[in-house]
Amino acid sequence: MLDDYYTWTYPDIPENVAQELLQLNGSLVVVGVVGRSDCDLANKMLAFGMEPPDDHTPEDGQIQCYYKPGTFSLLLHFESTYDAEISGQMIDVCIEDVDTPFDIDSFFERIRCRFVRMMLLALHVCHIVVYVENGLTFDPTLLTVFQLAKFAREQHLMQFLPQMLRETPAARISERTRLCAPRILFLFENFPGDEPKTRESVSTCEFQMEDCIYELLGRYNIVTNSSSNSLVALPNNKQFVFFNAHEELRDDKLLKAIDCLNETMYKPDLKEEEEDLEILAMAPFDGFVKPFTMPVYEKEWENLQYQEDHTVWNFLQRHVQDALVGCFDAGSFKQHAQQGPFQLLNSQEWHDCMATMHKLLVENAKDPDHETSNEEYKLFLKNFDEDLNYEKKFWAHLCELGLKKGIAAYKNAAPANYGTATHRQLLADATLAFEEEGRGPQAQAALAKLAAICHNHWEDGRQQCELLSLRSHPCTLPKNMPHEKHNSGVIHISTCNCGRTQGRREDPFNLRQANYEFYELIAQMCNLCVKVKQYQFPIFEPSVSDYRAAAFEAAFPLLNTGKSGAPQDEDAGEDEAEEEEGQERELPTKKKLQNTASNCCSHPLSPTFGSDLNMSIAGFGASLKESQASSEQLSNSEQNTTSSGTSSADTENELVVELQEPAKKEAREDVGPTDAVSTSTTEYLPGLVHTVSNFGLLPLFPSWSLACVGPSSIYSHNTGLQEHFQSGFLSGANFLLPWDVQLRLVHALKQQYQQQHHGKKQQRWKKQGDRLSLKIFVGMEYECSRGHRFMMCAPDRVLRGGADIERDTCSKVVHNNMPLYYPCPCRSQRNFLAQLMRIHVVTPKAPVNIIVDPKVCVGRYTFTLGSIVPPRLSQSAYWIIRLPYVYQGDDVLIAPPDHLDPDYPLAGGYLLPGMFGVVETDPTLDLNEPGMMGASAAGNFTRI
């Protein structure tokens, strides 16, 4: 026995206490105390002046009993998960379980379900239930607890308790399954600190809280007019809310000691007596033991008396007396139950009922292997926690609605087949549709399920091939259906090799489609391409049926091991010529290989625009007449011999071209080209020819094009390129740039050959230092995917008309790096990139030939035409060099940039300067003969 009360842990009741309780006969009122606590012992009995033993350890579901002799009330303290100490123990257990992640929602549901179970037990074995709240306001979550308890009682307990209680010692309460509709009381351990602790203020707070609680319990049908349908009962015209305003339940030890000292030294007056003098002598300083308080007046005395009477015990005993005198339900319900008033049992009968209810509601629930023949009770044990987690069901229902809405939004908007980008957009739209309904802890799992369902729907015959084209566009054809070639649905506008005809081209998926097949197809529709003769680049000619692409390892250095040495420069001396003739006799095999390499051109080109090529410009009509002035201007650009008294400034800007000896030319006819190499007939070059690729490997098809589209008279510098000849040019950007090149011809020192040939024409070249002024027209053409074409007058400037053409304009494009990509000036919401696609060259009518050797640097590769000997352009003709549409190295595709950085315009690639050269016209070389264009001595031309 502690102080003036007994305490024990149920069911271990001491014998002497059991005897005292038996003496009460049928006057035992059972009071249950539930609620929240913050102390270490999970004690909610401090307001009643009771504490558990010092060795007490709080546990979930443990019941501590208290009985004060001389009273008629037995207090049951229910330790539950709402106690901070017990919930802390549960958190520690969850943290120690490292295999299971901590889920706050599941943890909260578990806490609430266990508390509802203890609340159900208290409501069935107690006459009065005191809910302890350590806050200052009513906890609205308690309404949820009451609703769940009422649901569990009506839907589960009432289905099996009446039948199961009939077979137990608790048969007396089998019909109603409880002692009565328990009266619910509310104890608030703390009082608002900003309110005065007077009788009026405390009573006002209690009355306001009672009105609030009564309204809430009535609104949610916790309290009804019928005792059988009510979970709890509220007293009529009697206080059921108590605020602990005067007692410090968990006070400070130091402050309590000071208060005790103050009470000991309290005196009703300030008079000093003899015994006071003895105390004053022991005081450490003057005034130490003076009275702390002033005399108490009558009103203050009333407040002190109210504080003594305003206790929880007195508050509880008033309701206990109602139970003892039989007016417990008086005024609480308008409709009384037919079973009669509540029951007061003796201690033995109550213990039998308590043992039965505790076993049915608490003990059996902890045993997962418990067997019972009652199906309703079996469902209660199995589904109790799941049935109480109504939020989980609610969130699951919302997520299910959102899932249906999201799936419908995805399927309704999904086309027949679509790619990853469309799938992601549809999934994002479906997610937004889901979020209109679905939310809660299960939303993430539902979203994952939505993504899986949408993904399966996409893969069920609706997935696109999505192989990226060479322009980084995915294929739109179905993935699971066979198709001969890929199609991205993107259409580009491109121009043929000669530049006259534009056509629609599909997005290419391989190098052959990009650089060869389209131009071969559109050439059949162009009435100019089918007539012009094009330079035939060397390509792979297999000797076996199982030929394959050459393999390139990433770690293998790009070294040109198969490239032959550079051609040796010819000297003017006769001795060196004799040595070359000797080498010719000694190397017959080499000569044979060289002739084989030079015969790769199946369509010979004429050095002059003869009758065969005149067919290609038939039908131009008025355009030829309009270009007559340009023709006269170009014809006047022949060699102009000047006196040896040329100014020094002109001499510095001149290019020196050394004329070869006739003996040398004759020797060259026999020797042929000096750079012939053997080529593989079993392996081909998978990409384009570049500077470090093996000369023994040739591509399967040419990616470049070189065509003579007509005589130089086709172009008129006054009108530019006309639409009927070159279509798709932007206004003002259709002019070629004039380029004046000064040459000085240096004759051979040997005069024997010249003395034997005394012709009028030969006499013109006898003068050493003859000078020529060449006028070449050059155009760097760019083309965007919409078919817009324009010329550039500088690496960073688009030609805007004839006013942009100055004397040195052409030098800016031939002597500088020209960007491979440049923003198209066409007006469009999207910024299209134009690509350098053609180089226009109008050659002069002069005793020299123009040599072209373009080199395009893209990434780590520098791509070339692939010819060992650079092509020699015929005189007084209009030539067009078409560059590759797509560039590919040995085994790496070089995709065009998505956008161009203005600060780095050459990042996507550039055309190297110095692609033009000039060489003396060889009258002994007939370019109409197959292979002779490649037989010219390429090593002797002068680079402009």
UniProtKB/Swiss-Prot annotation:
Chain intervals with Acidic residues compositional bias: 568-583
Ranges annotated as biased composition (Polar residues): 628-650
Keyword Hydrolase: no
Pfam families in the cross-refs: Smg8_Smg9
Annotated GO biological process: nuclear-transcribed mRNA catabolic process, nonsense-mediated decay
Keywords (A to Z) from UniProt: Nonsense-mediated mRNA decay
Region (Disordered): 560-597, 628-653
Role this protein plays: Involved in nonsense-mediated decay (NMD) of mRNAs containing premature stop codons. Probable component of kinase complex containing nonC and recruited to stalled ribosomes.
Assigned protein family: Belongs to the SMG8 family.
Name of this protein: Nonsense-mediated mRNA decay factor SMG8
